[in-house]
Amino acid sequence: MRFDLERPLQSAAAHRVAVLLINLGTPDAPTPRAVRRYLAQFLSDPRVVEIPSLVWQIILRLFILPFRGVASAKKYASVWMPEGSPLRVHTQKQVEGLRHLLHLNDYTVIVEYAMRYGTPDIPAMLNQLKLAGAERILLMPMYPQYSASTTATAFDAAFVALRRMRNQPEIRTVRQYADHPAYIAALAAQVNHYWHAHGRPDFAAGDKLVLSFHGVPKRTLDLGDPYHDQCQQTATLLMHALGLTSVECRVTFQSRFGKAEWLQPYTAPTLKELGAAGVHRADVFCPGFTADCLETIEEIGMEVRDEFLHAGGKVFHAIPCLNAAPAWIAALGEIVAQHLQGWPVQAATPQSASVA
């Protein structure tokens, strides 16, 4: 195996600490070609699709990408922002918010982001951080609940990149924060902030809050993946923080792909059932998504909304994700600070009051 050439650093640039936020990824453009390229990388990951590679690649290349690329491109085009992909835009704002918060608290820490699929990719960003003098790097997945198909594959990509390095940095990883008090408080603050602006559902009259998490195949639960349990844990803590019961609040799973059974209940059919049952208002919030993206804006805000209204529901609200909300940036700073303990960052724990 050939190792990467190490470039000499000036002494002033060395011995730095870095935080790398990692999210799933996004196409570079809302075009069929860009979307096919992105989906080919995403759906070729054996952590995502656990089917023998040879068989799966035939199915993927011949039957999925030619058709799904065009359909998905139209969906991406419907949510694309002037600045680019919503996920990329919100992730960049999270980086800026965290960077600002840490700076206010006298942290001398580099903060950047990478995408597991698409650009900027994890190997490229690790190399960039090394060139900036980072000898200690914290990998911070933006997935609060651990899953092999999200968190683990992000770490896989980082460790593969490390294999090529002659001079490896020290690495720490954040495995999950599904029950972290600051994360739960940020979720509750986001929901309450939305309700303050748009009115609170009339739960006494039967209105519902639906907490929709990204789905995964049920087989992964049977094989020992903790994702389902951690989603339920987050939902229970959030319901408690909001003062709601399981009658007023439902937990569902979205974005099913293929014909295999996934974690249930499914989001879209649940909203259709609620509309048909006479529920007047349904609010949907996605606690597992730390930034708005195709799955929250288009799938929830458009497709699921239509299912609910066409079934008989009257009022639908898609509550925005955490994005760069002050409470979330403060929580992110608290979680990061806890995992940076013992490294030379020259500061104390960030304070939420530091964020405007």
Curated annotation (Swiss-Prot):
Keywords: Cytoplasm, Heme biosynthesis, Iron, Lyase, Metal-binding, Porphyrin biosynthesis. It holds the Pfam family Ferrochelatase. Pathway: Porphyrin-containing compound metabolism; protoheme biosynthesis; protoheme from protoporphyrin-IX: step 1/1. PROSITE patterns: FERROCHELATASE (PS00534). Fe cation binds at residues 214, 295. GO terms for molecular function: ferrochelatase activity; metal ion binding. It comes from the Bacteria. One of its GO terms (cellular component) is cytoplasm. It is found in: Cytoplasm. The keyword tRNA-binding does not apply. InterPro entries: Ferrochelatase, Ferrochelatase_AS, Ferrochelatase_C, Ferrochelatase_N. GO terms for biological process: heme biosynthetic process. The keyword Cell cycle does not apply. HAMAP family: Ferrochelatase (MF_00323). Catalyzes the ferrous insertion into protoporphyrin IX. Belongs to the ferrochelatase family. This is Ferrochelatase. It comes from Paraburkholderia phymatum (strain DSM 17167 / CIP 108236 / LMG 21445 / STM815) (Burkholderia phymatum).
